[in-house]
Amino acid sequence: MNKKLLDNYDKMVVKDTVAVIHCAFGDTPHTVAMVSVDKGLLDTEKCDKAFMLTNSIDNAWWKNDDVTPMFDGDGCRSTSVGDQVLVGNTKYECSPYGWEIVT
């Protein structure tokens, strides 16, 4: 099988897609990335993975595998405390001590 077919299989069968929403620092909430994460992870683990993949460490985060950037322009800040991740129909906010469900 070719790589594109295997990638599509992963996205449909093996992985979930979560949305990363920047709203910290007074930002108007806006989706900055869609991140592919393993389906078998707990929701908070999916949030952790999305957080890690949307932080620039050695390279710009939007160049990471499993990340689809959704922002306009040349760049975007890293995900921070106060930002959110949408997993299925549940939205989580990044707190200083983990993830809290947004009601």
Each model region followed by its residue ranges:
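N-terminal non-globular leader segments, chiefly Sec-dependent signal peptides
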Residues: 1-64
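Short alpha-helix capping/helix-loop boundary micro-motifs
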Residues: 64-75
